[in-house]
């Protein structure tokens, strides 16, 4: 197997990452993995390319290592590569990635256990690497590898809690002795191991009886039993665990924790957060240690500007509450959060985080125990007076501030709250002004979300709600294309305010405005939006639909709507009719609705609309109102109705949209099998009993061929002879290519699926055609033509002609067999071991070959009128001679 160069591996990796399953369908897993591992050992591949290749093992280990045998082989090969690599700074990045790749393969494929020799060797190797404290043996250049090894061990300890619990003394000594930049990784590793060991002891309940001291001083082998039962560590689970160490054990553990906390300022903010959280869990389980141990750190953390460190304060407060934080501390934190939400030097996402912290603030004595949004009791109206949203804020900040202030004014009473509600309403009106003056999509969405928030909290303020309704009506009449926004607002507020009348009031007001419109050009232009609103209003049984029916009748009778026969408009009309048919007070509008449907079924110029109107007319005039509602709301999912029944299609329910939706097939039921050699004719094979309306679609991956038209197959039954389809190929350039193939088909239950089939490969050999000559031409004429073409194809600087020679060691008999098997159709002459071959490649190119054997060596002399063909011809000749 020839080694691939760096460029080809870059393309290979990109192709694999885009679609791993499709890629592995074209080549075997074992073959590709073997090639990858082999080239990782090659000196011809750049180091950066090798890192890219190992990313496949990091991202897709389950695809490349499907069984335990493959996992062991892969891990062993990577270990051997790692051991053979020199300890140079140049190879350091590659060595670190090798460690990560080995660990990922072993953990992801569940091969990290005591029965795996590679797992044992890898764990021992990691401990050996990190034992070089302060770079005494390998030097500074090896420090990144030590850091990576620490992270690998931390990952193992996180996946298998307690795995390193019998090595705690050695880990602690290394953590204390390490004074380089790697100290951070050693500290985090030891802290995770300590927390898991405490948790393991706390699960036994009761006094530790010296078990904690033994664990802290243990220096034995790895605890492989931890790999047998993986335990998922949940932060909340530690609250139910309790460890009661003795006084001496408490003193030792407290000394260790104090030293870890003293070193915390040496760590990066993110690592500090990780360290604090691990120690918080330890203190929460070891009840004999007071949370006051964190007091010295709070002085530093209270003044921090770093997000991670501030998050550590909130984590401590959520766990320890008033055991660590006083009322003054809590008040200070709330003030700090309010100030940080508007700090000019902070980015918008950070300020939004602080706003969210206000809504989920861990209070010392919370009034409620739910995890939903709640304001702290100490947060007052005066403290939030500077948080008023304005149009200069970004949209997320605007809505978050409105949400916080709405909760503040809702929970407080008095003049401050009344003024605050008025200010918030003015803010909503300022957004309204921007939307009314043709605001963009983002500001429009923000306005409707702001309206929803205002209605959610202040729906009891009748004056503001009436003004809001008037403004919304005015906005709709000036911009009817906002109908989907209005419908969504009505739906969401109705869900939110189940027993409130405002959504119905808004719906009724919109209906009144629409039905009073004249049937002029402006109304007809926005008729589609009006019909969407009326269709939604018709779903409210408390709103009379008489005016809607009269408006629809007037629109149809007094306009050219029917003569135009627009399918979309006709179905929009019938959608309103369908919801009106389900109305409880149908008798009051029976005559008007019947006239409308009868007019549509006779006058509308679209047959589909006519049929649907006829169905609704028949139902209206022949079925009682109770049965009518059940028929139109019938869903096949809830009854025994066939999924393709007419009622399910005509009611526009979920099943109708489901049938119109093309789904992605979970597994491929179709395949194309070639039936004629040399001709692109295939038979369709199916694993399903029956498929219908099959459409085969072909997509070019390049521009070398003309597009292939879709091929339609009416049906396919598993017990019948499969149909044969022929694919017509029209090349623009005579080079190999690949067509992506997909199929769309319907199953017996009426659902349409789309699936990808195996790609269609067009090889270089398949484009060979004999010279287009009359069939009755004598051999002499063909021979003369070959000679003239051979002379004409002599290369020079003025053309693209080229000649080449291909030699391969073989006997005369072998050469004869090769020519007979591969070029018999294209042979012009065969005389005394010499062969003259002429090949035509559409659309307009040729390849001429003069083949002869000398001294058991076959010599292929080649001339062509397109030098770009030579690499493909060379590959083809290599293939046939090797065979």
From Swiss-Prot:
Going by the UniProt record, its keywords in alphabetical order are: Protein transport, Transport
Gene Ontology biological process terms from the UniProt entry: endosomal transport; protein transport
Q: Secretion signal: which residues?
A: none
- Extract the Pfam families matched here: AP5B1_barrel, AP5B1_C, AP5B1_middle, AP5B1_N
Q: Which GO terms describe its cellular component?
A: AP-type membrane coat adaptor complex
What the protein does comes down to: As part of AP-5, a probable fifth adaptor protein complex, it may be involved in endosomal transport.
Question: What is this protein identified as?
Answer: AP-5 complex subunit beta-1
To which species is this protein native? Xenopus tropicalis (Western clawed frog)
Q: Which gene encodes it?
A: ap5b1
């Amino acid at each position: 197997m020839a080694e691939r160069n760096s460029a080809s591996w870059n393309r290979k990796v990109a192709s694999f990452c885009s679609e791993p399953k499709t890629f592995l369908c074209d080549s075997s897993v074992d073959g590709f993995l073997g090639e990858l591992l082999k080239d990782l050992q090659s000196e011809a591949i750049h180091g950066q390319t090798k890192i890219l290749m190992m990313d496949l093992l990091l991202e897709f280990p389950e695809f490349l290592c499907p069984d335990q045998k493959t996992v062991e082989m892969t891990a062993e090969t990577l270990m051997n590569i790692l051991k053979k690599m020199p300890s140079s700074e140049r190879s350091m990045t590659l060595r670190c990635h090798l460690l990560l790749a080995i660990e990922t393969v072993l953990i992801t494929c569940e091969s990290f256990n005591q029965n795996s020799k590679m797992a044992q060797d890898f764990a021992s190797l990691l401990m050996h690497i990190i034992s070089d404290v302060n770079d005494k043996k390998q030097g500074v250049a090896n420090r990144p590898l030590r850091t990576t090894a620490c992270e690998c061990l931390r990952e193992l300890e996180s996946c298998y809690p307690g795995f390193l619990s019998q090595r705690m003394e050695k880990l602690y000594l290394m953590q204390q002795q390490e004074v380089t930049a790697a100290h951070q990784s050693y500290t985090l590793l030891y802290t995770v191991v300590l927390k898991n060991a405490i948790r393991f002891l706390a699960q036994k309940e009761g006094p530790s009886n010296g078990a904690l001291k033994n664990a802290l001083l243990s220096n034995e082998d790895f605890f492989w039993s931890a790999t047998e039962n993986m335990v998922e560590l949940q932060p909340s689970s530690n609250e139910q665990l309790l460890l009661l160490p003795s006084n001496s054990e408490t003193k030792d553990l407290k000394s260790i924790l104090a030293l870890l906390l003293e070193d915390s300022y040496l760590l990066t903010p993110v690592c500090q957060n990780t360290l604090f959280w691990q120690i918080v869990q330890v203190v929460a389980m070891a009840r004999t240690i007071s949370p006051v141990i964190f007091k010295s750190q709070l002085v530093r953390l209270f003044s921090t500007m770093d997000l991670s460190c501030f998050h550590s304060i909130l984590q401590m407060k959520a766990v320890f509450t008033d055991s660590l934080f006083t009322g003054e501390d809590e008040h200070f934190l709330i003030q700090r959060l309010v100030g940080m939400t508007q700090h000019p030097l902070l980015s918008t996402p950070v300020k939004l985080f602080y706003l969210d912290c206000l809504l989920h603030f861990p209070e010392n004595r919370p009034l409620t125990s739910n995890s939903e949004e709640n304001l702290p009791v100490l947060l007052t109206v005066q403290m939030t007076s500077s948080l008023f949203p304005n149009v200069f804020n970004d949209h997320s900040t605007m809505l978050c501030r409105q949400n916080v202030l709405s909760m503040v004014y809702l929970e407080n009473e008095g003049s401050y709250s009344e003024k605050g509600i008025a200010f918030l309403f003015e803010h909503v009106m300022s957004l309204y002004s921007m939307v009314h003056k043709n605001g963009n999509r983002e500001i429009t969405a923000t306005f409707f979300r702001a309206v929803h928030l205002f209605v959610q909290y202040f729906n009891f303020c009748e004056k503001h709600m009436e003004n809001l309704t008037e403004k919304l009506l005015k906005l709709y009449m000036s911009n009817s294309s906002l109908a989907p926004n209005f419908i969504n607002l009505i739906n969401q507020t109705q869900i939110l305010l189940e027993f409130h009348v405002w959504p119905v009031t808004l719906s009724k007001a919109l209906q009144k405005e629409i039905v009073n419109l004249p049937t002029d050009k402006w109304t007809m232009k926005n008729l589609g939006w009006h019909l969407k609103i009326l269709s939604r209003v018709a779903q409210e049984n408390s709103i009379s639909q008489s005016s809607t029916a009269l408006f629809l009748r007037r629109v149809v009778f007094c306009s050219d709507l029917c003569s135009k026969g627009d399918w979309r408009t006709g179905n929009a009309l019938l959608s309103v009719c369908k919801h009106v048919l389900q109305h409880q007070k149908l008798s009051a509008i029976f005559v008007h609705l019947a006239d409308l449907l009868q007019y549509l079924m006779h006058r509308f110029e679209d047959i589909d609309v006519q049929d649907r109107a006829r169905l609704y007319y028949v139902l209206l005039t022949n079925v009682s109102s109770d049965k009518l509602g059940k028929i139109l709301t019938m869903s096949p999912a809830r009854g025994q109705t066939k999924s393709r029944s007419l009622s399910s299609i005509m009611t526009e329910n979920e099943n109708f949209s489901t049938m119109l939706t093309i789904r992605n097939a979970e597994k491929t039921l179709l395949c194309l099998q070639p039936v004629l050699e040399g001709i692109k004719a295939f038979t369709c094979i199916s694993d399903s009993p029956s498929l219908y309306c099959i459409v085969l679609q072909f997509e070019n991956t390049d521009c070398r061929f003309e597009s292939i038209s879709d091929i339609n197959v009416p049906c396919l039954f598993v017990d019948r002879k499969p149909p044969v389809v022929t694919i017509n190929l029209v090349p623009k350039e005579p080079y190999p290519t690949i067509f992506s193939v997909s199929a769309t088909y319907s199953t017996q239950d009426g659902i349409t699926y789309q699936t990808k089939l195996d790609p269609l490969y067009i090889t270089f050999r398949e484009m060979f055609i004999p010279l287009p000559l009359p069939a009755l031409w004598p051999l002499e004429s063909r021979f003369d033509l070959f000679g003239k073409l051979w002379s004409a194809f002599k290369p020079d600087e003025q053309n693209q002609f080229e000649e080449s020679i291909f030699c391969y060691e073989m006997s005369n008999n072998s050469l004869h067999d090769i020519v007979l098997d591969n070029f018999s159709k294209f042979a012009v002459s065969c005389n005394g071991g010499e062969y003259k071959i002429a090949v035509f490649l559409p659309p307009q190119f040729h390849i001429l070959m003069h083949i002869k054997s000398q001294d058991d060596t076959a010599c292929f002399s080649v001339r062509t009128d397109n030098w770009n063909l030579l690499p493909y011809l060379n590959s083809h000749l290599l293939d046939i001679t090797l065979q």
